[in-house]
Curated annotation (Swiss-Prot):
Residues carrying Phosphoserine: 113
Sequence segments annotated as region (Disordered): 455-479, 625-751
Protein name: Protein WEAK CHLOROPLAST MOVEMENT UNDER BLUE LIGHT-like 3
Similarity annotation: Belongs to the WEB family.
Pfam families attached to this UniProt entry: WEMBL (PF05701)
Length: 751
């Protein structure tokens, strides 16, 4: 409706704006009356009362065409515009005069319209109620063009639909953004991972750069030494050419000074290496002391835990007594519910127990598989050790030229390491074989346990049938004793489990300490090896410099001797050296050679001492590795004991629950024995004869192999038994489980 009103207002404004200049009436504006047609000319028009123009000369009045406007109430494909048909001029209708709007009385318009510039006369005899006359020279052809001059056509319904569509578009974009959020998060995570990888690569490159820097420094030192040696050799050659003697030669002196400086640097480095070795040994001793203190503290903690366990035993016994009293009170209330669900619960519990045992066996098999994998890892390590051995052999072959005496010791060390690795491999193989045998034994034990459980179930059902006749009181005492015994065994199992846990924690701590010690020793070994390599390189450089010096001396001697002979033969001014001077010079040369040899022997002895220290450190490392292997074995044993103790505890708890349910049933049977009718007893006898009271074994979802006839025979045989034999059977039905549990635990401890 609002759109229709607006269109009509715009049309009125247009019709008001296109008047002619010859009109003497004042300007008018349409309010809400669009077109008024009076077919009867005699009808009185109240709007023409104030008109003063003569009747004979009617004014020029524009005949307004009839406009057909069709608004689409239902929305089309393009709902933004209304379909307005072009104005078609229909047959002529009587002329009409339209009064001016009320606004014209208050705000009269100017002579010229501000919008279109059409002149209008304001002179009218009755200014109080002016009449507007519309007159145009050419009529407009289409309403759409006219309306477009005033801002176009609008549809508020279409506008609302546009806003709704925009909102929908915004919601869809939001949903798309929310869907794309996890992808962007993944991309961000991938970028972070790439960042971390880049940082790791940077760290690795930094380490490589540092290593290369160290190698560069070493190469620069060697290059400087080589340059010094070459310069000294050149100087000596120049002196020899000039004819300078050995005593007055500067090159020989500088060579001796350089050799002394190098010897001093080598000795200082050897001292620093010794000091570091002493520091490492002192730290190792301190760590051993701390280890002993930790072991003492662990022993003290174990003693305290045992004392606490003893106190807990007394409290647990008191708790068991109180629980028995409470259960005796609650049995009367829970009789009906236990009778309803006893059979189903027994079956489900048996199935659950067997599944649990199977899971335990599977866990043992998985553990053994893990041990086999660990053995494979040890094999791989042994292969790497063999490769390292091969590398060491190659290094030894290269080092034979330098030190032949130390070859035998290093070979013996390598052979000892190889033998120890072979022994470890044999031990691992033996452990694997033991684990396989343990798996086989566990499977056999599982089968025997299944058969024994079936037998025990049959015995339990037979005892239930017998106890319903009147032997519940005597069996209650025996069951109470058995309950106390089982409670004690449960406490023992809990103690053993806690002891195993404590041992496992202590062994883990010791393992961690041993690993730290081994890492520290490895670091010290690496530093010592690097320094030994540097010392060897310096020794080689010193030997090369000595060789160069000896070669230079020999060349000088040869040149001097040749020059002397030539001078003696050719020139009369030749210098002849006496035999004493010659002997003195030869003695000096021999002394210098002996000094160089003594220095070399000292350096070699220092290297041997460093090698001995290295062998000692290697022995310590081997001892630490052995201790670690022992600790690992102890850890495995402790974990196995803890698992077995947990399993035994669960089995004993299940037996206790069974016994409690049986005890409650017995008491209810005792209370209801006098109330039994002969018909009920007869029906029970029939059920027994038909085999309804037959025992069933629900292990692995299979029924017992006994048929109806055998069930009847067993019931007849059981009725003939005495109360003493019944007590013994009850005890035998419960004790084999305890015996099997203890035997399993002992076998595991022997392993």
């Amino acid at each position: 409706m609002l759109g229709d009103d607006k269109d009509s207002d715009d049309l009125n404004l247009f019709l008001n704006a296109i008047g002619e200049a010859g009109d003497e009436e004042g300007p008018t504006s349409f309010n809400d009356i669009d077109f008024l047609t009076f077919d009867d000319e005699d009808l009185h028009n109240p709007f023409q009362d104030c008109e003063t123009s003569p009747i004979n000369e009617p004014p020029k009045v524009y005949v307004a065409p009839r406009v057909m406007i069709s608004h689409q109430d239902s929305f089309s494909e393009d709902s933004r515009t209304d379909v307005i048909e072009d104005a078609r001029i229909l047959p002529a209708s009587p002329r009409l005069r339209v009064p001016a709007s009320p606004r014209a009385f208050v705000y009269p318009r100017s002579v010229e319209s501000p919008r279109f510039g059409s002149p209008r006369s304001v002179e009218s005899p009755c200014f109080g109620s002016p009449i507007g006359v519309i007159d145009t020279a050419s009529p407009f052809e289409s309403v759409r063009e006219a309306v477009s001059k005033f801002g176009g056509i609008t549809d508020w319904k279409a506008h609302k639909i546009q806003t709704i569509e925009r909102r929908k578009m915004v919601d869809e974009e939001l949903e798309k953004i929310q869907e794309a959020m996890p992808e962007y998060k993944r991309e961000a995570e991938l970028a972070e991972e790439a960042k971390y990888d880049a940082l790791e690569e940077l760290e690795n490159t930094k380490g490589l750069i540092e290593e290369l820097k160290l190698e560069l420094e070493k190469a620069e030192k060697e290059e400087q030494q080589a340059k010094q040696d070459s310069e000294l050799a050149q100087m000596r050659v120049e002196e020899m050419e000039k004819g300078v003697a050995n005593e007055a030669s500067v090159a020989v002196k500088t060579q001796l000074e350089v050799a002394k400086a190098r010897q001093v640097s080598a000795t200082s480095e050897l001292r620093s290496v010794r000091e570091e070795i002493e520091m490492v040994s002192n730290e190792y001793k301190d760590m051993l002391r701390e280890k002993e203190l930790a072991a003492e503290r662990a022993d003290i903690a174990v003693l305290e835990a045992k004392e606490i366990e003893r106190t807990m035993d007394g409290l647990s016994i008191e708790l068991i007594a109180t629980k028995e009293l409470l259960e005796s009170v609650h049995t009367a209330h829970l009789e009906a519910e236990e009778k309803r669900f006893s059979v189903a619960m027994a079956r489900d519990q048996d199935v659950y127990n067997w599944e649990k045992e199977l899971k335990m066996v599977e866990n043992d098999i998985e553990r053994l598989n893990q041990e086999v994998r660990a053995a494979d890892d040890v094999k791989a390590k042994l292969e790497t050790a063999s490769a390292l051995q091969h590398d060491l052999k190659t290094e030894l072959a290269a080092f034979t030229d330098i030190s032949s005496g130390n070859l035998l010791l290093e070979k013996n060390d390598i052979h000892a390491a190889v033998e120890s690795a072979r022994r470890e491999l044999e031990e691992v193989k033996a452990n694997i074989e033991k684990a396989a045998s343990e798996v086989k034994k566990l499977k056999i034990i599982a089968g025997s346990l299944q058969s024994e459980l079936g037998r025990e179930r049959q015995d339990l059902e037979e005892t239930k049938q017998k106890e319903s006749t009147g032997l519940a009181r005597t069996n209650d005492k025996d069951a109470g004793e058995e309950l106390v015994e089982t409670a004690k065994k449960l406490e023992q199992a809990t103690k053993e489990a806690e002891d195993a846990k404590a041992l496992a924690t202590a062994s883990r701590d010791e393992l961690r300490m041993a690993k730290e010690l081994s890492e520290q020793a490895k670091r010290g070994m690496s530093t010592i090896e690097s320094r030994l390599v540097e010392a060897k390189k310096e020794m080689e450089a010193a030997r090369a410099s000595e060789k160069l010096a000896l070669a230079a001396i020999k060349a000088l001697q040869e040149t001097e001797s040749s020059q002397r002979f030539e001078e003696i033969n050719n020139s009369p001014r030749s210098i002849i050296i006496s035999v004493e001077e010659y002997y003195e010079l030869s003695k000096q040369a021999l002394e210098s050679e002996e000094e160089a040899n003594t220095r070399l022997s000292e350096i070699v002895s220092q290297i041997e001492v460093a090698k001995e220290e290295e062998s000692r450190i290697l022995e310590k490392l081997e001892e630490v590795n052995r201790e670690m292997s022992v600790r690992k074995a102890e850890l495995k044993e402790a974990n196995g004991k803890a698992e077995k103790a947990r399993d035994g505890k669960l089995g004993m708890e299940q037996e206790l629950r069974k016994w409690r349910s049986e005890n409650g049933k017995r008491r209810t049977d005792e209370g209801r024995e006098p109330e039994k009718s002969p018909t009920r007893s007869s029906t029970e006898g029939r059920n027994k004869e038909n085999g309804f009271g037959q025992s069933k074994s629900f292990a692995f979802g299979e029924q017992g192999s006994s048929s109806n006839n055998t069930g009847g025979s067993t019931t007849t045989n059981n009725n003939n038994l005495t109360p003493e034999t019944k007590k013994k059977k009850k005890k035998l039905s419960l004790f084999p489980k305890v015996f099997m549990f203890l035997s399993r635990k002992k076998s595991h401890s022997h392993k």
